[in-house]
Every structure is written in structure tokens, then in C-alpha cells.
Amino acid sequence: MTDKAGDWQEHGPQVEEAPPQVKRPPLFKVIILNDDYTPMDFVVEVLQKFFHMDRARATQVMLHVHTRGEGVCGVFSRDVAETKVNQVNDWSRQHEHPLMCTLKEA
């Protein structure tokens, strides 16, 4: 019995280290919302400028938004998604359009 107690005192407790459990950060969808006033060409321009879509893809997303009320522009980390939402909303206001983006957890 003294051997075991002596071992513990000399070498400390025997502990196995578990590998760290790192979670991926949550992703967020940037959602563009339809309105009755923003011209379709402006929406296409926004999708090309801020989401780097080619004209065909931007037109496809714009038509989806027009018919369904909203559409996904992309999926990003929270910081990037928030930045893109702010950029689109600011750009729209500067050009006097009510176009808005929001984000939802993916």
C-alpha cells in the first residue's frame, strides 16, 4: 500500500490527455428580401458586386427572390455574413432603394 501511495506522490496522478474538441463556427445564410420598388437590374448588380456572382447566376437568384420573396446569396461565417448584410443595406440606401438583406443561421 505504501508503494502505491509513494508512486502517486513521486509521479503525480496518472492522467491521459484527451485531444481538444474544437467545434467549427456556425455558418450563416445571407438572405436577400424582395420588395416592390427595387429595380431588378439593381438586385443583379448587388449580387454581382457583393457576392461575386456572374450575370447569369445573379439573374437566376434575382428571379428566385422575385417569385419566392427571398433568396440565399451565400453562406458565410458570422462576421463575413454580417459584413455583407451591412454592405448591401448601406449600398441600397445610398442608391435610394429599399432592398434589404438579413442573415439566418444555416
Swiss-Prot record:
Quaternary structure and interacting proteins, as annotated: Binds to the N-terminal domain of the chaperone ClpA.
- Biological role: Involved in the modulation of the specificity of the ClpAP-mediated ATP-dependent protein degradation.
What family classification does the UniProt entry report for this protein? Belongs to the ClpS family.
Q: Report any Pfam family annotated for this entry.
A: ClpS
The leader peptide range reads: none
GO process annotations (BP): protein catabolic process; proteolysis
Please give the superkingdom of this protein's source.
Answer: Bacteria
Q: What is this protein called?
A: ATP-dependent Clp protease adapter protein ClpS
Where is the region Disordered? 1-21
Which InterPro entries does the entry mention?
A: ClpS, ClpS_core, Ribosomal_bL12_C/ClpS-like
| Bias (Basic and acidic residues) ranges | 1-14
Q: Which organism is it from?
A: Alkalilimnicola ehrlichii (strain ATCC BAA-1101 / DSM 17681 / MLHE-1)
* NCBIfam families per the UniProt record, alphabetical: PRK00033.1-2 (NF000669), PRK00033.1-5 (NF000672)
